Amino acid sequence: MVPRSEDGGGEGHRCSSTPPEVRYEMRPLRYSINVTLDGCCDHRAIPADEDLHRHHTENLNQADALLFGRVMYEMMEAAWRPPAPTGSRPDWMEPIAQTINAAKKYVVSSALERVDWNAELVRGDLRNAVQQLKRASGKGLLLGGVKLPLALAELGLIDEYEFVVQPRLAGHGPIAA
């Protein structure tokens, strides 16, 4: 599934709401999600191939921190935190694994008591906490998941949206509402 913006080709298609020439006074909060034609964003319904991982690694390299809710943090930690058993994933997954492992992570959760894996809990008023993260110096924040992005969209805090549309129907799972 290669997202291609230059010619619209490939099996997946990237739709972004912000032109690359836009400059922000604060570091931008970017939201990127894979979604099927029926709006499903369940990672199990979307095959993760080499091109898709390469695209998401490029997105990760445009940010200096990741912002997750509890569910997304736990899912990403289970998938990417080292050590991965030998032979458990193809070599082409290593760049994204290394990038995610090295990234600073912020986790919005009232349920978790502590986090590690280069992560910090975000508590208190969501609007103020995220605005504070955006005011910090850096390249940007990359947001993933479903529930937290919905809350942040309602607060008007997301600066860029990217939907990587997968040409399939899932028929089940969470939807990007």
Predicted regions: what they are:
Residues M1-G12:
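Extreme N-terminal basic, low-complexity initiation segments
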Residues P19-A177:
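Enzymes that bind and transform nitrogen-containing heteroaromatic metabolites
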Residues D7, T18-P19:
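Serine/proline-rich low-complexity intrinsically disordered segments, especially terminal tails, linkers
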